[in-house]
Amino acid sequence: NPPQALLNGLSIQPVKVLKNRQAYFAVYESAMQVESLNTDSQLLKTLAPHDVVATAPSDEYDFVSRYFWPASGGDEDYVTGSIHTGLAPYWAKLLEKTQLTAYQASSRGGHIQCDVGESTVTLTGHAVRYLKGTIYL
């Protein structure tokens, strides 16, 4: 059963809730539900260490999503590659295809191409560099 804080923290009730190590996945019937979803950050923060992703099938894309992470220091992430490594296998199985197009419906929004392999997920898309540096190991 999903935690009450999750259900109360989402303005629209999901049809299904799944969970992995990173987040609760609130699955909706339509992209419109995901796009119009409001959240209560204070309630979602109590779900730490888990964040929350809302997702649904879409007419324009294979699936859409939004990613909320108040427990980690922000309300909603613009485009989140890591969460798509969990979403893509779910939608690939459901839609019976391995190459998917996704849209993260944040205020800035972003398109992600997902290629689901046997044990890997490859993501491609456009990014904006915000930092440049060198790491020495």
Predicted features, each with a name:
Residues N1-L137:
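Active-site proximal loop and beta-alpha junction motif in alpha/beta enzyme cores
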